[in-house]
Swiss-Prot record:
Source organism (scientific name): Mus musculus
Motif Nuclear localization signal mapped to chain: 575-579
Encoding gene, per UniProt annotation: Znf496
A Pfam cross-reference name: zf-C2H2
Phosphoserine modifications at: 182
GO cellular component: nuclear body; nucleus
Protein location: Nucleus
Annotated spans, Disordered: 1-41, 141-167, 358-397, 483-506
GO BP term (any one): positive regulation of DNA-templated transcription
Bias (Pro residues): 26-38
The protein's name: Zinc finger protein 496
Coiled-coil residue windows: none
Domain KRAB: residue ranges: 220-294
Domain of life: Eukaryota
Amino acid sequence: MPTALCPRVLAPKESEEPRKMRSPPGENPSPQGEPPSPESSRRLFRRFRYQEAAGPREALQRLWELCRGWLRLERHTKEQILELLVLEQFLAILPWEIQSWVRAQEPESGEQAVAAVEALEREPGRPWQWLKHCEDPVVIDDGDGPAAPQDLEQERMSAESQSYPDAPPGALVQGTGLLSRSPGQPSEDLVPQDAFVVQEQSIRDAQPVATCQLPPNRVSPFKDMILCFSEEDWSLLDPAQTGFYGEFIIGEDYAVSMPPNEPPVQPGHSHEEENGLRVTEWTTDLQDKEIPQASCLDLSSLQPFQGEERRKWEELQVPELQPCPQVVLSQSPCPAGGDPPALKSSLDQEVTIEIVLSSSGDEDSQHSPYCTEELRSPPEDLHSVPAHQSNASAEGEVQTSQKSYVCPNCGKIFRWRVNFIRHLRSRREQKPHKCSVCGELFSDSEDLDGHLETHEAQKPYRCTACGKSFRLNSHLISHRRIHLQPASQQPMKKSEEEALETEGTGASDLLEKSKAKLSFQCGDCEKSFQRHDHLVRHRRHCHLKDETRPFQCRYCVKTFRQNYDLLRHERLHMKRRSKQALNSY
């Protein structure tokens, strides 16, 4: 037989302890003189009600006392307090069956709680193996253990009875996490809500979920039902699902049915699914009656449907689509006026596409004298566009595209910045702009304009020997040195150098010798120098000694022609005297 599920599981430690009576709400179960344990303070803090206090100030003071007893502010740090809060919330969000077992382990941190849950999941059958039949579990409360399930059920049933005062005694009521009977029914038939209603998200979220309605006032717990699969379908289930359904049962021998004490159902109201799972319906007409969601069992997500089988299952749940009505077009003349265009005869198969040309809508009235006010069409006709609308749409595309990138060179307009940058790069690779003066090529017209300015700039410095002009005086001076050299010592031209290089090794040796010739010669002593500054230094020190030297040193008899040389010489005297003064001390 399949494994049945019971919503109440007794913790291992509680079953071994002696039977105790529950303490009244708000009373401290600890011995006199001893403070309550943190777990007791936590439960009292969570279960505290406003009606237990005399007023709002007393209620707030009581909450402060319980919170301090739970978190122990004088002992714990901020990180430890945060760990306690996270652990309490983690245990609260666990399923009820696993939560009872984990709380019985008394974890002190979130890591210990996670390790306990993981150890429970790693064992064979996963958490469902620990869910077993239990008659009436012993309720034990010593102030440190978890809350008993019976009290939580009573509180939940009382809250649900207030929410549904008109519900019949035997009806199922949907609560926050459980599908339970009304307060008049016994608590042994309580089953988890997830076992009866399984939500499935699909592309048909807008359609109501087709479920099987149980007979009124005859609701059986999920543990007494039998889920039967074929041998082929059983092999497709994973270990978690096989642990959930229990042992293998042949589909021809059993079906999803009521317990044996229930009367048999009519064979006309049951249908078989191709995947081996049989679902029995106790309703006569699903289309005429509304199906209450609280008393429904949806087994669609429990089946390993794939491919064609899943499509057939969805077809059984979703009604057939009705044919879509024909296209309804209503036209009215635009304010601009004009004659209506000739429409085709088959308007029911055509779809007009409206293109907004501007945010204000002023340009729309200039292109089409008729505007479409209402349009309904099946989605399969969206590809067909009438001929009289294609031209208007083409014009709209040209006007709506904001081409804000203009090439400054060729004047092309681009809508996207990427295409504009790609065009500029291609322009840089090409050099279509040529200088009319020197013939240099440029990729941009701006570069060419900047280059032409160099040709048109003023050159006030002109050479008197050859007539060349220069913008800077330093360029003119370096140019005049060529004319000061003798004709035999002037540097060779480029054409002569190229001719000597092409003649052979002897010509190349001659070229090196000609370059090694001294090109600057002194006019007084006929000495030659390779550089002009060497010649100037030679004339200053050798041939200009007889000239007057007006600058004389104050510390020695040396004279100088320039004041700069005198200052540099006196600086040496000052350094020498400062060293002597330091050595004297």
